[in-house]
From Swiss-Prot:
GO terms for MF: 3'-5'-RNA exonuclease activity; magnesium ion binding; polyribonucleotide nucleotidyltransferase activity; RNA binding
Species this chain originates from: Chlorobium luteolum (strain DSM 273 / BCRC 81028 / 2530)
InterPro entries associated with the record: ExoRNase_PH_dom1, ExoRNase_PH_dom2, ExoRNase_PH_dom2_sf, KH_dom, KH_dom_type_1, KH_dom_type_1_sf, NA-bd_OB-fold, PNPase
Binding-site list for Mg(2+): D503, D509
Keyword Ribonucleoprotein attributed: no
Protein name per the record: Polyribonucleotide nucleotidyltransferase
Localisation per UniProt entry: Cytoplasm
Length: 732
């Protein structure tokens, strides 16, 4: 049976959800449509009982944009979609982060959500529709799921908030924020803004949440009509005697350890020792208490002998101890108060050959950030369903295993690295100079050397500092901070600059980046229900104070961008040439432009309008390239003196001289010197660079070719060496 539900969200935005037509063998499948953009989402969850040793939810979310959806061919030799693009990975992460908290605690069945974009009108982006479709697919399935979830994008054009703005509307929007949530609460945020205030952000979130409520209700109605019963699920129940024993065995030790302000490695070692000792004692205790007959009569008692289950119980007490310490005493694992930011150190120019660099250290989190400046040719070509463009500002984030003291594989860039890099990039992009002001392609690379929380925000701070060190004229400096939340009933505490443990054991990870004038990017993940706007307002205000503190430290290190680019950065010079001369500069098969590059070391880029951009790390190379190009397009004029190169010597005739690139003229034997010349080779040889004057231009009546008559005698100077042929002419 095909069931379709439709809703009008206002502003001409109509969304429909359909189930029962496609992918009927999946546990759940829906098609969501807005305009002519359509996505199909499917979900399948394994019915195989997971191992009792499993302690994570193996949820896989895949988002794919099919090129046929927009009537396009994929690029590359094979002409088919291959590995996911960065856009697809980021969209999948958005959906995953919103869905994951809504599955029941302890549900560890392998689950796969696949979202395919099957039609694109190239105006309505499909990413947030994918989140809606995924939630709806789970709702109409038999898979346990707490609440319907919906995702929307909020923009603002001319002061008016818009739900799911089109690509054209986003061009004029000062907000681009994706929001995921249920009818009761927000569980995910991510977006970029043009320095908006905290109050404006809250207004945008509230506006988006109203649309989310309507979409969640639509899903509930759809699921009600499908009326598919949820499969039975009972989470693993830990025996009460095990919980009691573990509490008595380790709670006091964990509490004592929590109140010690220790370094990350020391704390990890001492925590590991408590775990090992408690597991050993518990197994000894229950092995003696339970004989074979008791285990046979009650198989659940075997859980008391399971090392993994015991460690999970210890972990729950460790989590509770840390949370109560924060809520009751306002103290944190490293001894800070709730709002205190860890010590910050900054070093600039640490990589001599980079075009800008910084080493940013905050507590036990450290980022080494380098900047590379390039030309338009270095821009990244990005092709998506909705547009094709050259990306000239990028930030890449690397998180090697040694940064957390581990051994690991070094493979392709992971989803987490792509997501963190994108957030840092969006944070800084808003203050980057425009192409007219700064026509460089900019690549920032953040190498995380140490990590104990908030490495993406360290990348924002380090990236800003590296750009300023490199002389990139940022509009304003940007800093970022990660906020945390501990909530128990009505009690809550907001934490500034969270540690890795506080992120892991807490209820929220809220990253905020911005300038002194407003927020430029944010990302939030919530692990609990019931986050109200009052808490969010407090978190934003506290984040603002933290950002300003970090900005103070950054401005102490470097108050403004350096006035000069780095020594090894390319210098860009732009000149305008006639459009009809472009082919002359490029040459046959690019021969001429390649020879200029080889000769001068400069990189040359030519636009269709005749703008020639020359990039070279030395002023000499730039000057030489400009002179060659000007000489190339120069029209020979009688009476003008040129610096040319002898190409051929004919003893009884004269010398052929290349006086402008690719153009030769003849210095007749009688025009070489005021003295009588009997043998040209006595005076000139191939390769000599000489000054000549153009004395005549005439057409050969037999061939129709233009002949150029040159004179050394008219210049009245001896041959000179060291000046390239084709230098800019000297007017007589």
């Amino acid at each position: 049976m095909i069931i379709t539900k439709e809703i009008n969200l206002g502003q001409g935005k109509t969304i429909s959800i359909e189930t029962g037509r496609m992918a009927k063998q999946a546990d759940g499948a829906t098609v969501v449509r807005m305009g002519d953009t359509m996505v199909i989402a499917t979900v399948v969850s394994s019915r195989k009982t997971p191992s009792v040793n499993q302690d994570f939810f193996p949820l896989q979310v895949e988002y794919r944009e099919k090129y046929y959806a927009a009537g396009k061919f994929p690029g590359g030799f094979f002409k088919r979609e291959a590995r996911p693009s960065e856009k697809e990975i980021l969209s999948a992460r958005l959906i995953d982060r919103a869905l994951r908290p809504l599955f029941p605690t302890g549900y560890y069945h392998e689950t796969q959500v696949i979202i395919n974009v099957i039609s694109s009108d190239q105006q309505n982006d499909a990413d947030v529709l994918g989140g809606l479709a995924a939630s709806a697919a789970i709702m109409v399935s038999d898979i346990p799921f707490e609440n319907a979830m919906s995702e929307v994008r909020v923009g603002r054009v001319n002061g008016l908030f818009i739900i799911n703005p089109t690509i054209d509307e986003l061009e004029g929007s000062d907000i681009d924020i994706s929001i995921g949530g249920t009818a009761d609460t927000i569980c995910m945020l991510e977006g970029e803004m043009k320095e908006i205030s905290e109050a404006e952000m809250l207004d945008a979130i509230k506006f988006g949440h109203e649309a989310i409520k309507k979409l969640c209700q639509l899903q509930n109605e759809l699921a009600g009509e499908v009326a598919k019963a949820k499969r039975p699920f009972t989470p693993l129940q830990v025996p009460a005697e095990l919980s009691e024993y573990v509490k008595n065995a380790c709670e006091s030790s964990l509490k004592e350890l929590a109140y010690k302000p220790l370094a990350k490695e020391v704390r990890a070692d001492e925590t590991k020792a408590i775990y090992s000792e408690t597991v050993k004692k518990a197994i000894e205790h229950f092995s003696a208490a339970f004989g074979p007959e008791a285990l046979a009569a009650d198989p659940s008692k075997a859980l008391c002998l399971n090392e993994h289950i015991i460690e999970e119980e210890i972990h729950s007490f460790e989590k509770n101890v840390m949370r109560r310490m924060i809520l009751d005493d306002g103290k944190r694992l490293d001894g800070r108060n709730l709002e205190q930011v860890r010590p910050i150190t900054i070093e600039l120019g640490v990589i001599p050959r980079a075009h800008g660099s910084a080493l940013f250290t905050r507590g036990e989190t450290q980022a080494l950030v380098a900047v590379t400046l390039g030309t338009k040719k270095d821009a990244q070509s990005v092709d998506t369903l909705t547009n094709s463009a050259d990306k000239r500002f990028m930030l890449h984030y690397n998180f090697p295993p040694f940064s957390v003291g581990e051994v690991g594989r070094l493979g392709s860039t992971g989803r987490r690295e792509i997501g963190h890099g994108n957030l840092a990039e969006r944070s800084i992009k808003m203050v980057a100079p425009g192409e007219q002001e700064f026509p460089y392609t900019v690549r920032i690379v953040s190498e995380i050397l140490e990590s104990n929380g908030s490495s993406s925000m360290a990348s924002v701070c380090g990236g800003t500092l590296a750009l300023m060190d490199g002389g990139v004229p940022l509009k304003k400096p940007v800093s970022g901070i990660a906020m945390g939340l501990i909530k128990d009933g009505e009690e809550y505490a907001v934490l500034s600059d969270i540690l890795g443990n506080e992120d892991h054991l807490g209820d929220m990870d809220f990253k905020v980046a911005g300038t002194r004038d407003g927020i430029t990017a944010c990302q939030m993940d919530i692990k609990i229900d019931g986050l109200d706007y009052h808490i969010l307002e407090n978190a934003l205000a506290q984040a603002r104070r933290g950002r300003f503190h970090i900005l103070d430290k950054m401005e102490e290190a470097i108050p403004a961008s350096r006035e000069e680019l780095a020594q090894y950065a390319p210098r860009l010079t732009a000149i305008q040439v006639p459009v009809e001369s472009i082919g002359l500069i490029i040459g046959k098969g690019g021969e001429t432009i390649r020879s200029i590059t080889e000769e001068t070391g400069a990189e040359i880029n030519i636009e269709d309008d005749g703008t020639v951009t020359i990039a070279c790390s030395s002023n000499e190379g730039t000057k030489a390239a400009v002179e060659i190009i000007k000489a190339l397009i120069a029209k020979p004029e009688v009476g003008t003196i040129y610096v040319g190169k002898v190409r051929d010597v004919r003893d009884e005739l004269g010398a052929f001289v290349e006086f402008i690139p690719k153009t030769d003229g003849l210095v007749h034997i009688s025009e070489i010197s005021r003295e009588r010349v009997t043998k040209v080779s006595d005076h000139l040889k191939v390769g000599d660079r000489i000054k000549v004057k153009l004395v005549d231009i005439r057409k050969d009546p037999r061939t129709g070719k233009t002949r150029f008559a040159l004179s050394m005698k008219a210049v009245d100077e001896e041959p000179v060496n060291g000046t390239e042929a084709g230098a800019a002419p000297e007017n007589n």
